[in-house]
């Protein structure tokens, strides 16, 4: 009866799929399975024969449709194979019911099929890398004079390397144990429904102090070798949504200022902090309520010589900027003696009238700002009283980078509001949106701009800190470059001096949609000279499910949507964006290996369905009904435009992404060959599963990653930003997982590493407040080091 029921489901669903122009397999398999089930209920051996033939043809179809890819084959074959075992076991009884010889062949067939099912289940517990790694470069020892001393910037260096010249923990011994400083509980648990507080911190380390910030911008200093709290500064910034602090800035007045060395740089302005004055060493934080705050790194006291009691109001000059329309979640950038801050705008599909995306650099004392207003780039002065910076212009919400030799800041720009409707965008919006922008750090003057998406209608804003590398050329020389990953899965390598691509970028024709007066770009860039991560052009055969049934439902949903590839423009019908606005690659950024010319990228692969709803319809009225700002999913009003929008993740009935795994990977990109050296799935379903139910199974399917990576000269890449509760270390040469340490809750943070001057031990530190979408929350900071020798 069960077989007949499943056959009926396949028959009905298959008929719908076939009517949409999809595969006929499910209709035919449903017909055969239903017939077989009825015959088996009637105790007719012909039912087993019918199912046997159908299963044999299913094997042929599965190999034709999916090739030898493991997870697609599991989805197509596991349920039919399990039924085949039951049918084979029933064969003797069916024969006996007709007084026919039974034989023993059926039991042998059932045994073989059962072993195949068991082998398939066993295969779920081993990784299936999309690109297998070979023996890569060996370790290069850190020269004595090059040992890293501090992790004093968000990306370790001002250029966002996320690389540590440390090798005490290395690929031959890299199995550290949890120890001091942690677990430490800073006392602020980030409880969130996905739209509120999240711990997404990358700490700083300077000397014997580790610096933290909480989602409400409270600042904490810990002893780097014991984890003891040294001081705490309560800021208690508030906002109605999106509370997070991803990092901090640091400045030391006793450190020598860098001297720009390229031709014709502007000078770095000198600053003086009196001996004995507070804040000779200072921490900077942007806040979720729109302030830039400076405190003494030694004591936590506010810096009296900076702004008003160490605080600068970043909403000044913006015009109307009510909560939560102006927030800052990424760290300020200390560029020489200029502190540069961008801003996060509340979800850019809420309304057209939003605070502008001005980028400002604050000097020491008195506070003055030099900035770039993307709506008025030639005027770098603050607006006069009663006026404001141009509204709704492209913003910078991700971390920024700095090259001291050029005295240049590199900004990853977002888009103007709103994300999905561009009919009213200006020429300057088109110039700056979704671009890398290079500015003079002292004056704010523009040096160059390079755009990665034209008239962005997908929320493909640049999400990460640009990383500064020396890019290997074919002749063995190196060119100073900027490398950045995008939500669209592209990796761009740009000349640091000119902004011109160092690898091939091709403009490809793209289609528009049916939105009136939209300024559709006829072409979009693809960075074809570098690997593209997770950007496969989906077909019906790429649809997946935990079973063949939900795979069929995903196929039906896919065929009901308009999909034309990466740049499928939103319209009034339901369209699919893959990868969607979640990425691709996101704010965790790239990590680099400058010794071996490799970069490492983690990604997520989540499609979104999108539908623009004309404002004069009842559906649009429903879409404008008080949605929470910044959720980014569901119905969003697009106030000020002729449309509302409805969008959400492209998931199966079980809450699983509809395309085949992996859903998150870690990739090593060889800059010399400009190819993927290895790519492995990251994360298991141990702490999550269908409907949010934990499966408690370490199945390495590859889960969406959110958070950064850390590479070391010890030949390791660390990552913790998965849906399960682990910090992992991978061999940077092969992609093999060498170690994982269990965390009390998940982490969205970026790992850092340093050597304590007191203990001489290398620590890897991670902040763990809970994985995204996970109800398990905490406030842990955990350090790992090699066990003491006994």
UniProtKB/Swiss-Prot annotation:
Subcellular location: Cell membrane
CDD domains: PQQ_mGDH (cd10280)
Pathway entry: Aromatic compound metabolism; 3,4-dihydroxybenzoate biosynthesis; 3-dehydroquinate from D-quinate (PQQ route): step 1/1
EC identifiers of the protein: 1.1.5.8
Comp. bias regions, Low complexity: 174-187
Gene Ontology CC: outer membrane-bounded periplasmic space; plasma membrane
Segments traversing the membrane: 22-42, 48-68, 77-94, 106-126
Biological process annotations from GO: 3,4-dihydroxybenzoate biosynthetic process; quinate metabolic process
CC cofactor: pyrroloquinoline quinone
Family classification: Belongs to the bacterial PQQ dehydrogenase family.
NCBIfam families in alphabetical order: PQQ_membr_DH (TIGR03074)
Name this polypeptide is given: Probable quinate dehydrogenase (quinone)
Species for this entry: Xanthomonas campestris pv. juglandis (Xanthomonas arboricola pv. juglandis)
Record gene name: qumA
């Amino acid at each position: 009866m069960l077989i007949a029921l499943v056959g009926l489901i396949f028959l009905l669903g298959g008929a719908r799929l076939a009517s949409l122009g999809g595969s006929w397999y499910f209709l035919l398999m449903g017909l055969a399975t239903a017939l077989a089930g009825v015959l088996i209920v009637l105790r007719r051996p012909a039912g087993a024969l019918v199912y046997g033939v159908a299963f044999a043809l299913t094997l042929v179809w599965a190999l034709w449709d999916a090739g030898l890819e493991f997870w697609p084959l599991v989805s197509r074959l596991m349920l039919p194979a399990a039924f085949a075992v039951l049918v084979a076991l029933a064969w003797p009884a069916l024969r006996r019911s007709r007084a026919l010889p039974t034989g023993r062949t059926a039991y042998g067939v059932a045994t073989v099929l059962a072993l195949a099912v068991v082998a398939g289940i066993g295969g779920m517990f081993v990784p299936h890398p999309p690109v297998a790694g070979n023996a890569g470069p060996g370790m290069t020892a850190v020269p004595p004079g090059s040992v890293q001393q501090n992790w004093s910037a968000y990306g370790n260096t001002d250029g966002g390397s996320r690389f540590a010249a440390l090798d005490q923990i290395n690929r031959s011994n890299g199995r550290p144990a949890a120890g001091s400083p942690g677990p430490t509980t800073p006392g602020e648990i980030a409880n969130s429904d996905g739209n509120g507080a999240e711990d997404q911190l990358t700490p700083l380390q300077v000397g014997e102090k580790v610096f933290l910030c909480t989602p409400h911008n409270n600042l904490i200093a810990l002893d780097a070798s014991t984890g003891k709290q040294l001081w705490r500064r309560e800021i208690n910034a508030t906002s109605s949504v999106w509370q997070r602090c991803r990092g901090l800035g640091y400045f030391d007045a006793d450190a020598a200022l860098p001297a720009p060395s390229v031709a014709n740089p502007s000078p770095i302005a000198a600053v003086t902090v009196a001996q004995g004055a507070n804040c000779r060493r200072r921490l900077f934080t942007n806040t979720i309520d729109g302030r830039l705050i400076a405190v003494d790194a030694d004591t936590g006291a506010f810096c009296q010589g900076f702004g008003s009691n160490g605080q600068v109001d970043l909403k000044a000059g913006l015009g109307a900027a009510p909560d939560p329309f102006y927030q800052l979640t990424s760290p300020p950038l200390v560029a020489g003696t200029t502190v540069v801050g961008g801003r996060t705008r509340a979800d850019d599909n809420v309304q057209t009238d939003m605070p502008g995306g001005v980028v400002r650099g604050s000097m020491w004392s008195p506070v003055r700002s030099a900035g770039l207003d993307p709506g008025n780039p030639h005027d770098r002065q603050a607006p006069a009283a009663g006026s404001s910076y141009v509204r709704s212009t492209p913003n910078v919400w991700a971390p920024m980078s700095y090259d001291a030799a050029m005295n240049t800041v590199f900004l990853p720009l977002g888009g103007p509001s709103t994300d999905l409707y561009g009919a009213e965008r200006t020429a300057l919006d088109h110039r700056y949106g979704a671009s890398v922008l290079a500015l003079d750090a002292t004056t704010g003057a523009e040096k160059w701009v390079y755009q990665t998406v034209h008239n962005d209608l997908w929320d493909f804003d640049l999400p990460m800190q640009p990383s500064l590398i020396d890019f290997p050329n074919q002749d063995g020389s190196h060119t100073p470059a900027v490398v950045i990953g995008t939500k669209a899965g592209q990796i761009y390598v740009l000349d640091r001096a000119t902004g011109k691509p160092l690898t091939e970028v091709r403009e490809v024709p793209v289609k528009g949609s049916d939105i009136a007066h939209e300024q559709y770009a006829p072409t979009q860039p693809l960075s074809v000279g570098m690997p593209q991560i997770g950007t496969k052009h989906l077909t019906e055969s790429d649809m997946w499910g935990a079973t063949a049934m939900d795979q069929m439902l995903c196929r039906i949903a896919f065929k009901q949507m308009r999909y034309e590839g990466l740049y499928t423009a939103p319209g009034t019908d339901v369209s699919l964006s893959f990868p969607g606005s979640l990425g691709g690659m996101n704010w965790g950024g790239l990590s680099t290996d400058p010794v071996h010319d490799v970069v490492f990228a983690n990604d997520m692969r989540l499609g979104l369905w999108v539908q623009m709803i004309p404002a004069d319809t009842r559906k649009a009225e429903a879409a404008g009904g008080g949605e929470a700002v910044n959720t980014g999913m569901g119905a969003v009003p697009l106030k000020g435009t002729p449309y509302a929008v409805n969008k959400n993740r492209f998931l199966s009935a079980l809450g699983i992404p509809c395309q085949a795994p992996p859903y998150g990977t870690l990739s090593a990109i060889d800059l010399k060959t400009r190819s993927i050296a290895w790519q492995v799935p990251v994360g298991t379903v141990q702490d999550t599963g269908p409907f949010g139910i934990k499966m408690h199974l370490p199945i390495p399917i590859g889960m969406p990653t959110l958070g950064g990576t850390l590479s070391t000269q010890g030949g390791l890449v660390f990552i913790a930003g998965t849906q399960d509760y682990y910090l992992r270390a991978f061999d940077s040469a092969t992609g093999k997982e060498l170690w994982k340490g269990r965390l009390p809750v998940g982490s969205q943070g970026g790992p850092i590493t340093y050597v304590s001057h007191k203990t001489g031990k290398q620590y890897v530190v991670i902040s763990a407040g809970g994985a995204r979408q996970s109800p398990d929350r905490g406030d842990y900071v955990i350090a790992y080091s090699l066990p003491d020798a006994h």
